[in-house]
UniProtKB/Swiss-Prot annotation:
Its EC number is 3.4.26.1. The keyword DNA-binding does not apply. Its main location: endoplasmic reticulum. Belongs to the peptidase U48 family. It is a multi-pass membrane protein. Keywords: Endoplasmic reticulum, Hydrolase, Membrane, Protease, Transmembrane, Transmembrane helix. Protease involved in the processing of a variety of prenylated proteins containing the C-terminal CAAX motif, where C is a cysteine modified with an isoprenoid lipid, A is an aliphatic amino acid and X is any C-terminal amino acid. Proteolytically removes the C-terminal three residues of farnesylated and geranylated proteins, leaving the prenylated cysteine as the new C-terminus. The substrate specificity is only partially overlapping with that of FACE1. CAAX processing is likely required for subcellular targeting of prenylated proteins to the plasma membrane. GO terms for molecular function: endopeptidase activity; metalloendopeptidase activity. This is CAAX prenyl protease 2. GO terms for cellular component: endoplasmic reticulum; endoplasmic reticulum membrane. Disulfide bonds: none annotated. Pfam families: Rce1-like. It is found in: Endoplasmic reticulum membrane. The lineage of its organism: Eukaryota, Viridiplantae, Streptophyta, Embryophyta, Tracheophyta.
Length: 311
């Protein structure tokens, strides 16, 4: 293990990051290709296998990263802090990045409001609307229980965001920064590696969903473009705040919302809201992610904390 004053080589950092990205994808095929297990009998079993593989990859990446980084203490709180897992300034690390991210979805949120109002009108307003609202809240417990047993919900909102942010943000960014890469380079290099973890979607589209080669390429190409953009934003949040919670909750929110709605037929306000939200996002990007809002000090930081260099 290196000491706190040492650094790591750029070649070692890049090789480690590439290896972790490939491992994150290839381990998904271990059950059938290497262990020779029979094909999953159900979608639930298939996803549970993938959850286990992703968890193993994540733990291995965290341990390997800890031995490469110039860490001076093995105390749990110190190690967790290296990965951005902290309890101090937690509400700031969740709320402010979520508010910032929601600005990009202003059009989507306005469209949802229109849908809610139309539903209210269809129910006649007044007492009928209160009955509708009461009925809605009564269905929440059942919806929660249904979601808790839905593997797709676990994949989209728990397993994928947590494992991806731990591997591609908590592990890779400290490695790149301690290797001497510039902050901007780390921000845009991680998303490229992040997109590699989604290349297996082409196989799923082409083989499992029986898409044509061209259609599968277009769909996956769009997904890769989106993951690169989001990955850069998530890396930006992680470096600026020093909090894993910032990109993690932004990731979950984006998975829930999907692609931002740019326009809707007959609803010009949706487009106006989207444009206004984008302008607000650009204007508030740096003010809402000031390092001092999320940290007690921005001086004398270890090499893996980039916010000291970007205060």
């Amino acid at each position: 293990m290196a000491t706190d004053g040492e650094s790591i080589s750029m070649s070692l950092a890049v090789a480690t990051c590439v290896a972790m990205a490939l491992f994150y994808v290839l381990i998904l095929y271990v059950p059938t290709v290497i262990l020779r297990l029979p094909s999953a009998s159900s979608y639930t079993e298939f996803m549970i296998r993938r959850f286990i593989c992703a968890a193993i990859c994540t733990v291995a990446s965290l341990v390997f990263t800890a031995f490469i980084l110039p860490i001076k203490s093995w105390e749990a709180s110190y190690i967790l802090g290296v990965y951005g897992i902290r309890k101090d300034h937690l509400w700031q690390g969740v709320v402010y990045p979520l508010l910032l991210t929601s600005l990009v979805y202003a059009g989507s949120l306005v469209l949802k409001l229109f849908t809610l109002l139309e539903s209210w009108k269809e129910n006649g307003g007044g007492c009928s609307s209160f009955n509708y609202i009461r009925s809605f809240f009564q269905t929440i417990p059942a919806s929660v229980l249904t979601s808790a047993s839905n593997v797709s919900v676990w994949r989209n909102f728990i397993v994928a965001p947590v494992t991806e942010e731990l591997v591609f943000r908590s592990c890779m960014i400290p490695l790149l920064l301690c290797a001497g890469f510039r902050i901007n380079t780390a921000i845009f290099l991680c998303p490229v590696l992040f997109s590699l973890a989604h290349l297996n979607h082409f196989r799923e589209m082409y083989i499992r969903h029986n898409r044509s080669y061209l259609r599968a390429s277009l769909i996956v190409g769009l997904q890769l473009g989106y993951t690169v953009i989001f990955g850069a934003y998530a890396s930006f949040l992680f470096i600026r705040t020093g909090h894993l919670a910032a990109p993690l909750f932004a990731h979950i929110f984006c998975n829930y919302m999907g692609l931002p709605v740019l326009y809707a037929n007959g609803k010009g306000l949706v487009s106006a809201a989207f444009l206004g939200g984008v302008v607000g996002f650009v204007l508030l990007l740096f003010p809402l992610t000031k390092p001092l809002m999320y940290n007690d000090s921005t001086n004398d930081c270890p090499c893996w904390l980039g916010y000291c260099l970007w205060n």
